[in-house]
């Protein structure tokens, strides 16, 4: 047993230090990034925010809506091949180019991904997603998927330390998904005692990935636009959002009415709700590691994503970053014990 003494930080522990800027308006900030991926050699241009691969967030409808903003969607893995075929026929090229096809690591899921990717040349991104990315099985699965799809962009996770980021990139992942336990409906840290404060995880994993020419997705922990900016400032190439994009008409969640008001069900993918729906209940050998909440119905996602991106633009003007690419170079975080004034409630 050993104890690491170095303090690790989450988004609530820091604020950006403002810096002198020549920017006159938020409209001057360029949020589009241009990426070339290490293994596939593919190029992509867009706003590097991703809707999380949860079935109460990342629907086909969400993918179409977010693509209008140049934003990506990791479509959840519970659609059938037939549903994907219909989506491939009806969606436009921009939407298809901005979706990840999500998968677990079983043999059946591998066969399913092969069928989905064969539906359209426009499917470029694969998201290999398991809760515990420290499994040797994940590394082997990444190698297998890379051998099958040498020209596709592969994301794999989730992990929170540089050593595992490096191993996954060397195994064939272009992007590594970073985050264990920070999500709004995740209870892994409570049920298991395992986790890592998200900002420190992003800083350390980003450093490891960039040293090998790979990239990272900061997955989870964002509760406001400022947190999204902090993730980018800490070195995340992409930021993945679940709860911030849940509860919308495009989210795909179940609508519930209580006291004359509409709510949408939102749950973690290791929650009792998810396992009841997709696995016939919680297996005897495991515990649910997520919760189910009812969110007030929020209407269309367009206003929400515009508000998030507007917040990131504003961050850039405060620190003098004309492009999102420059944000991490212009970032100085200060450690704090307060964030916002809550006299009149939370924003």
UniProtKB/Swiss-Prot annotation:
Residues making up the signal peptide according to the UniProt record = none
GO molecular function: any one?
A: GMP reductase activity
Residues annotated to bind NADP(+):
108-131, 216-239
Known catalysed reaction(s)? IMP + NH4(+) + NADP(+) = GMP + NADPH + 2 H(+)
Q: Which UniProt keywords apply?
A: Metal-binding, NADP, Oxidoreductase, Potassium
Q: Which SMART domains match?
A: IMPDH
What is annotated about its quaternary structure and interactions? Answer: Homotetramer.
Q: Which PANTHER family match?
A: GMP REDUCTASE (PTHR43170:SF5)
> According to its UniProt entry, what is the function of this protein?
Catalyzes the irreversible NADPH-dependent deamination of GMP to IMP. It functions in the conversion of nucleobase, nucleoside and nucleotide derivatives of G to A nucleotides, and in maintaining the intracellular balance of A and G nucleotides.
Q: What is the name of this protein?
A: GMP reductase
Give the organism the record lists. Answer: Vibrio atlanticus (strain LGP32) (Vibrio splendidus (strain Mel32))
């Amino acid at each position: 047993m050993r104890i690491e003494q170095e303090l690790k930080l989450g988004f609530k522990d820091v604020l950006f230090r403002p810096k002198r800027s020549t920017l006159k308006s938020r409209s001057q900030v360029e949020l589009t990034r241009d990426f070339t991926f290490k293994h596939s050699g593919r190029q992509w241009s867009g706003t590097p925010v991703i809707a999380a691969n949860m079935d109460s967030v990342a629907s086909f409808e969400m993918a179409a809506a977010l693509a209008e903003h140049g934003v990506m969607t990791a479509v959840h893995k519970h659609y059938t091949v037939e549903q994907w075929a219909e989506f491939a026929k009806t969606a436009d090229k921009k939407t298809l180019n901005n979706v990840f096809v999500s998968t677990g690591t079983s043999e059946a899921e591998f066969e399913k991904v092969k069928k989905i990717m064969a539906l359209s040349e426009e499917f470029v991104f694969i998201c290999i997603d398991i809760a515990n990315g420290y499994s040797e099985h994940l590394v082997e699965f990444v190698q297998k998927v890379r051998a099958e799809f040498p020209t596709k962009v592969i994301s794999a996770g989730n992990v929170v330390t540089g050593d595992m980021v490096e191993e996954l990139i060397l195994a064939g992942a272009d992007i590594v998904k970073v985050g264990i336990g920070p999500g709004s409906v995740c209870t892994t840290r409570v049920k298991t005692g395992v986790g890592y404060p998200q900002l420190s995880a992003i800083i350390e994993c980003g450093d490891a990935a960039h040293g090998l020419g790979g990239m990272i997705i900061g997955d989870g922990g964002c509760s406001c636009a400022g947190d999204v900016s902090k993730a980018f400032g800490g070195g995340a190439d992409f930021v993945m959002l679940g709860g911030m994009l849940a509860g919308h008409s495009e989210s795909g969640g179940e609508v519930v009415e209580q006291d004359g008001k509409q709510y949408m069900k939102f749950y973690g993918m290791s929650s009792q709700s998810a396992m009841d729906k997709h696995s016939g209940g919680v297996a005897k050998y495991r515990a649910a590691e997520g919760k189910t909440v009812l969110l007030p119905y929020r209407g269309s996602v367009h206003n929400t994503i515009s508000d998030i991106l507007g917040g990131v633009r504003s961050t850039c003007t405060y620190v003098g970053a004309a492009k999102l690419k420059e944000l991490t170079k212009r970032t100085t975080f200060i450690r704090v014990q307060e964030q916002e004034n809550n006299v009149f409630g939370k924003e």
